[in-house]
Amino acid sequence: MQPTPAMMQAATAAVDLALPMLHPADAVLREFFSTNRALGQRDRAFIAETVFSVLRHKRLLEQLVAEPTPRKLVCAALIKVQGFGLGQIETFLKSSDRDWTLALRTADIEALPAAVRLSLPDWLYERLVAETSEQEATAFGRAMLKTAPLDLRVNTLTADRGQVLRDLRASGFDAAPTRFSPVGIRV
């Protein structure tokens, strides 16, 4: 997908509102979308994913970007986290951004300390390693960086979980029954 400059500006504005972390990010986004009703479904999905990418990877992105402004954090998240190429976001970049974005593309994340790579506070990573192991602490950090799965509850008065699972799979969704709930589906 090629984000438009308007989508990039809206994502930057939403990140700017979410970064102070005065309210839960989903509440900030809900308010942002209610005041920006002209945004379409695709725009909203892009903005939400970008905001949550910035928040999940905040420590890493701040390490990679000198003077981390919301605009730079959005660009860094798109390049390093979401895998966008510079060509996909070049209409949003200023001429002064060329050097740091090129350096960002080649930045060696593996050379950074594990806590920074995983966007965890040092004290938390050290405590996880002390209480478990470095491997388990890394697995925990990686899990925290992933997008959460969507769990749905089937209304058993109107549908059967097995049939809903088959319908979702037939529609191309990777759906599975939940482990603990007999009426849940994880997408």
Each language-model region and where it sits:
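Class I Rossmann-like S-adenosyl-L-methionine
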Residues: 1-187
